Amino acid sequence: MSGIFRAGDRVLLVDNRKRRHLITLAGGGEFHTHAGIVRHDDLIGKPEGLTVRTTRGARLTAVRPTLAEYVLEMPRGAQVIYPKDIGPILILADVFPGARILESGVGSGALTTALLRAIGPTGSVTGYEIRDDFAQRALRNVHGFLGDDVPLDVQVRDVYEGIDARDLDRVVLDLPEPWRVVKHATEAMRPGGILLAYLPTILQVGRLREEIAAAPFGMVDTLEVLQRGWHVEGQSIRPDHRMVAHTGFLTVARLLTPE
């Protein structure tokens, strides 16, 4: 990736109050804000990390968005899985280059984008999404960050009715009743494959764990991730007054070979 901004690039503009704006550069384009106008031509051909001034003199820092920043700013319909959970999902599910993954509950495509970047060009992600409008938005978001040439197949279908693929390495679920998918996952995954589910409530987790316990899974864990920032300014060092606490529970299980 070049360090020079080009037309078509996604750019994150950050003001002195850390407010962020995601734009796509286009020749002759303009970004309008309460602090004035930024002309896209003032960015195209310039190096990443520069400070640009609006027509009213406000200063904005221009950078390419990281995946975490993109997830927080991208268009969404469904609620997204946030970066604090996406990172642990990639580690707990041991998502590796070349992995074959089934994801259900594609939503706005935040986790899909992270999975695709982790598996690289030799892997594949098949997404099941019951709503066509969510599927189309997810595709736009994925392509907006990774480009069009990605190993992704999003299908508008209900995973509760079954999974066609076989020998999957991973099944990743973000839907209300993942226990209805456990049987399908045992048929679709290879031995040693990993099932991971993201759920907002502990009652859902309990129901899922019951179904997992009745299937040939082992090494089962459930956890949640809490994120707390710190205020560091001179001699003033303390935890932030606010933290990103509960967003969801992560449950992970390994498919075993029955005795």
Kindly give the residue locations of the regions a language model identified.
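N-terminal auxiliary segments of SAM/dcSAM-dependent transferases
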Residues: 1-64
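Conserved SAM-binding loop and adjacent beta-strand
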Residues: 2-3, 73-86
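Glycine-rich helix-loop-beta junction characteristic of Rossmann-like nucleotide cofactor-binding loops
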Residues: 91-96, 118, 163-165, 187
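Conserved class I S-adenosyl-L-methionine
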Residues: 96-107
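Conserved SAM-binding loop of SAM-dependent methyltransferases across substrates and taxa
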Residues: 108-121, 186-187
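Short beta-strand element of Class I
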Residues: 122-128, 195
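S-adenosyl-L-methionine
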Residues: 128-178
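C-terminal substrate-binding/active-site "lid" region of AdoMet-derived donor-dependent transferases
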Residues: 179-249
